[in-house]
Amino acid sequence: MGWGVGPASELASRRAGVDTFVYGLSRDDGLFYPSKVGLMFGEDRQPETELAAYWRVSQNLHSLLDRGLDPLSVLIDRSHEKGMDFIASLRMGAVPGIGRPELTVANGGEGYVHPEVRSHQLAVLEELSNDYDIDGLELDFTAAPGGSGLSFPLGTGPTNAPLMTELVRSVSSTIRARGGQLGVRVCTTPALPASLSLDCCPGLA
């Protein structure tokens, strides 16, 4: 059960006044939960033939699934038991499970210019919002998943920024439709979208 209870319990036991647990649940090569719309880490390969750390992650995920437990739900529940809000953080440059890797910037595609990429990422965010008892979503534009954090090809950001704005508006609509209180964090500083040639923050309006 270390996968689910360890990080949350450790933070709470330090008595440091921590009241929020932000969990990065994706890499370029997979999501750390059994997604119905995306790719779970390790599903498309054999992690035991790679780094020991990858094997450990895959084994931890499957050890819970084999017992009928959802790894993400376990972590969320433990955070709530310890009095912490749970924020699900998604790397926006990663689209594991899209089925067409050639659409990503890392593989020569145009990233979020493609409707398929935007639809896929929105489906993952809707799944997190509707299927899990999270307290907030973080749209992480800063972490580089597997070495590529680009949403659009270099030099095309200003032209394509409205596409990202519309995607964030769609996320906002999903959050409002869910009801209750669910926070969304898009960027860590006001300067970040400008540095990435994105105009994403107005999408929350």
Give names to the regions the model predicted.
Residues G4-S35, L39, T49, L128-L137:
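Catalytic domains of carbohydrate-active enzymes, especially glycoside hydrolases
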Residues G24-D29, L90-V95, D140-P145, T188:
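Short, solvent-exposed turn/loop segments enriched in Gly/Ser/Thr/Pro and often Arg
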Residues M1, D44-E81, F86-D131, L198-P202:
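Active-site-adjacent "subsite" loops/lids of carbohydrate-active enzymes
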Residues G2-G4, S26-L31, L65-D66, T189-C200:
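Acidic-and-aromatic substrate-binding clefts and catalytic sites of carbohydrate-active enzymes
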Residues D19-Y23, F86-A88, L137-L139, L182-V184:
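Hydrophobic faces of well-ordered beta-strands that scaffold small-molecule active sites
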Residues E116-A205:
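Active-site neighborhood of glycoside hydrolase catalytic domains
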